[in-house]
Amino acid sequence: MGIRHELDILLVSENLALKNVELLKGDSYGCTINIKVNQQKKLDFIIILRPDWTEVRNVKKINMVCNGVVIDTTLIKKSFYEEVYSSSVTVFQNTTVEFFSDTSKKYKEEYPIVNINTIKRYYEIKDSRMTCINFESPISDYDQVNYLKDYINISDDYYLYDACDDCIISSDHDDNDNADDDEEDDDEVNDIEDDYE
């Protein structure tokens, strides 16, 4: 059947969870996140790896690169069932954040690519590649209780969101606005793609 790790990435500062980021099969995991900002912004990440021990004895460390600069990831919990990392970075411009366990082009070409627009507060999966990536916004109560409360050194503002005002919506979300608004949103999606091509 092959190795099947599980990888989730919580973008805590945007109340967004990237779920099932792992490859469908293989001892490699990672993704590329293009983030659009219009001002200085602190991005807080929690990375949750649930290893598949059927065919491996050790798991690979998760590396993080932001606009070509290596960022430290801190291992904050390790058990038989999961490894949890945290990382924070402050950005001043549109940013590309990469998470990866392997630097080989063979694997990196299979990692998913997502775009997150923090200005308009929506996301899109640009290319899911060899994954079944999906999103949750807001971050689920389960993830908040298990990962945010004890494992991240950030303000209580992030813990247990009461409303969906802080949610990020999918770029294909139908909010029944007029066609002009839809065209404006489409332009924004194209803008974020243009910034990274």
Swiss-Prot record:
Residues 174-197 have a biased composition (Acidic residues). It comes from Sheeppox virus (strain KS-1). Residues 172-197 are annotated as: Disordered. One of its GO terms (biological process) is viral process. It comes from the Viruses. This is Probable host range protein 2. The keyword Repressor does not apply. InterPro entries: Poxvirus_C7/F8A (IPR004967).
